[in-house]
């Protein structure tokens, strides 16, 4: 019995093994066992069905779908299937663990980046707050500076008002000084212009008329008048009162005449203070035979007559001043040298008397392009007696030149006669003027620490030192060079 039982168990086990559905090694999830059991069930059911052939025909996979069944070598036991499933699950577990670790590392990296970004953001916020605070402080400072600027502007505006007043006063004083210097230049240049022998009235006060003057040429009847040598009107006090001088003596030197002309051309306001000065210049009926004085007298009368014919006079304020008598005497001395040579050439003089005018007024004509009319200046009563005209038949024409060439020539003669000296009379003054500007440079060179390659000397100080050493010879050479043209001009005037 026992043997039969064991044999039946083995047969049943063999049948079970044979009837067990095939499990492939590739099927890790056991899907093949389910399909085999379903197939076996369907086969069992097919035995009871009335049409077993058709069911068997359609239940075979090879017949229906063309899929070959797996080989018996690939079939696994359930234990092997479990082991395969366990291995597969372990592999998946390892994969998930690896992925989890990767995710953890990524999370850590992101956390570190986030922390860094937070720190950077905090720093940026701190900088932004600091910038805002600095901006607020800067705005406060700007407001304060604006307030300071406004206060300074207000103070400057107040001061500018006072400065403008000062500038106006200074301009007024400058204008007065310009008129004074202009009149002094006229007084100095009058004598130099009168020494020229080639011009008819180049050095006379008629030159001081404006360039827009219509009367540039005057005839003898209009300017000087037709007077005979024996005409009593030549010695009348009414006609002689126009020049503003008193006739007292018959013997008058050329010096007095030139001094009178310089005073008239300089525009001196003849008042009570100058009465004694004017009374010293007396014009007589007889004058020495000098062409210089002849031109001077004719020019004076022509200038006065032109101003009367135009009937244009503007009363303006004039700055009173006292001319330097020393300069006038020096000019007169130079004129005497020229006049003494020409004294013997002319034996007769051409008088130029003027028409009747107001005896209490004299006209001062100033040189300049800006003035358009002469200025009348009140003077004391005086008379004038011109010389007797020995040649009354010839008309005398006075031409008032306005060309620039003659003015430049006259200016050149004055500059040649008056050389400028850039050195003083004392040697010590010139020495100090050369040496003193170099003292700060020398002191700086002595006290400062010189670098390598820096020159010891300064070019300006070196030049001043050379000039200091040769100052004596330089002064002598410059004086000689300035003295030569003056001597040459003096010699030319004597010739």
Curated annotation (Swiss-Prot):
Major subcellular site:
membrane
Keyword Coiled coil (UniProt): yes
Q: Subunit structure, per the record? A: Binds to STX1A. Interacts with DNM1; this interaction inhibits the binding of DNM1 to AMPH and DNM1-receptor-mediated endocytosis.
Sites of Phosphoserine modification: 200, 204, 219
Q: What is this protein called?
A: Syntaphilin
Name the membrane topology term.
Single-pass membrane protein
- GO cellular component terms? cytoplasmic microtubule; membrane; mitochondrion; neuron projection; synapse
Annotated membrane-spanning segments are: 427-446
Known InterPro entries for this protein? Syntaphilin/Syntabulin
Q: What does this protein do?
A: Inhibits SNARE complex formation by absorbing free STX1A.
Task: Report the domain of life of the source organism.
Answer: Eukaryota
